[in-house]
Amino acid sequence: MANVYLFGASGHGKVIKDILNANGIKVEAFVDDNLRVNECAGRKVLHDAGGLSPMIVSIGVNRIRRMVVDRLVAKAGAEGHPLEFATAIHPSAIISPSAKIGEGTVVMAGAVINADAVIGKHCIVNTGATVDHDCVVGDYCHIAPGANVSGGTHIGEGSWIGVGACVIQCLNIGKDSMIGAGSVVVKDIPDGVTAYGNPCKVTTNKSTDNIMINSNLTQSVGGGKEKLFLFEMPAMSFRSRSVKTA
């Protein structure tokens, strides 16, 4: 594989860099909107993604990762540049030969993906997570460290299974939902909710991954006026780093 670019100069990006390096693949550079960031994990940080390929979007928040992929695809199409998304799988991960893994997806150290499981595009199967036989995980999902998803379960696009959560077999978890850390999921979960506990129960109809974010984030890769976005989470809020928008 050619050298890879990582969009997102972040802690998550550092882990992906290590995974690629463990496979003998060099990270050519990071890409990030924050013009104040010029180095990450010993690699330079670029501020324009135009013409850079192959790429992995190294952003942990599902909704932002999806937005960035969409704008990279749109930018490449408008400028006539080829764009390929790479996949990163740690050498210690155990992947069934019959499993399918989509482009842009990252599988971290110690993860297990069993027979006939399907992992969508731009997903994260994090450290020590397991996805068992015949599961279907939609695009832009995140299976957090130590989470266990039992056989035959379907997880909708953009959903987040929290650290150490357990999901019993043959359930359906809707799209854009968040399962809290340590939860035990024993029944289906609808779209767009936050749910946690043992047993796991829906607590709100707004997923905590529904980040309040100005749509301008989708319109540029570097340059323009600086804005500060507010991330809202249950019982807390925190301000993101500043990013560059048109």
Describe each model-derived feature in a short phrase:
Residues M1-D48:
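Hydrophobic, well-ordered beta-alpha structural blocks that scaffold small-molecule cofactor pockets
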Residues A2-Y5, V27-E28, S53-I56, L83-F85, ...:
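Short active-site oxyanion
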Residues N3, F7-I16, S98, G110-C123, ...:
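Short, conserved structural micro-motifs that define repeat-unit consensus positions
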Residues G11, R63-I64, V184:
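Short alpha-helical
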Residues K17, L35-I95:
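Phosphate-bearing ligand-interacting subdomains
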Residues K17-I19, M67-R71, I119, P190-D191, ...:
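Short amphipathic alpha-helical segments
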Residues A74-D132:
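Hydrophobic, well-structured mid-protein blocks that either form specific transmembrane helices
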Residues T127, V136-D139, A144-S237, T245-A246:
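Glycine-rich hexapeptide-repeat left-handed beta-helix
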